[in-house]
Structures are given as structure tokens and as C-alpha cells.
Curated annotation (Swiss-Prot):
The gene is groES. The keyword Repressor does not apply. This is Co-chaperonin GroES. Together with the chaperonin GroEL, plays an essential role in assisting protein folding. The GroEL-GroES system forms a nano-cage that allows encapsulation of the non-native substrate proteins and provides a physical environment optimized to promote and accelerate protein folding. GroES binds to the apical surface of the GroEL ring, thereby capping the opening of the GroEL channel. It comes from Symbiobacterium thermophilum (strain DSM 24528 / JCM 14929 / IAM 14863 / T). Keywords: Chaperone, Cytoplasm. The keyword Cytoplasm applies. Belongs to the GroES chaperonin family. GO terms for cellular component: cytoplasm.
Length: 97
């Protein structure tokens, strides 16, 4: 994938949740919750303040992050699903460990 997000945007590959319940029932797509975790695939250069100072994002490529449930724009690139998020507003936390 060759995508470079602009500004403070981040490209995320959502992590899919289990498609079966603990009792073994297969969940249809309509019953699945939207993923809220994903892996950072690409990071924009950050935001520019009015003074001209560049503010880089705290996340980097390879980080696993938790993001707002209905945030971002879903896109399909090379047949794969991705979400483009505002890296400052939509990403809530970096998963460590």
C-alpha cells in the first residue's frame, strides 16, 4: 500500500473481532460491532500551527491504537479495508505491551 495521509491524519488497518460467540454461534455482519482497535499503517506529517511550527503526532507506524467507534472515513485500497482518522481527535489511546 502506498498512501501518505495529509496533515494530522492517520491510516489504520482495523483489527477484526471474533466472528463467533463463546458458545460457537457465528455472528452475521449485521450483528458485529464496529472495530475500535487497529494498527497504524501510515502517519501524516502533523499539523501546522499559525506560528508555522509543525506539531507531529504521538502515534507512529506499527502502533496498535484504540479509536472512537464511529470516527474516520472507511476506504478500500488494493482490496483491503482501512480507516483514515484525525490522529489528534479520533485516536484515544496507544495499546502498549
Amino acid at each position: 500500500m502506498n498512501v501518505k495521509p495529509l496533515g494530522a491524519r492517520v491510516v489504520i488497518k482495523p483489527l477484526e473481532k471474533e466472528e463467533r460467540t463463546k458458545s460457537g454461534i457465528v455472528l452475521p455482519d449485521t450483528a458485529k460491532e464496529k472495530p475500535q482497535q487497529g494498527k497504524v499503517i501510515a502517519v501524516g506529517p502533523g499539523r501546522t500551527l499559525e506560528s508555522g511550527t509543525k506539531v507531529e503526532l504521538e502515534v507512529k507506524e506499527g502502533d496498535t491504537v484504540i479509536f472512537s467507534k464511529y470516527a474516520g472515513t472507511e476506504v478500500k485500497i488494493d482490496g483491503e479495508e482501512y480507516i483514515i482518522l484525525d490522529g489528534e481527535r479520533d485516536i484515544l489511546a496507544i495499546v502498549q505491551g
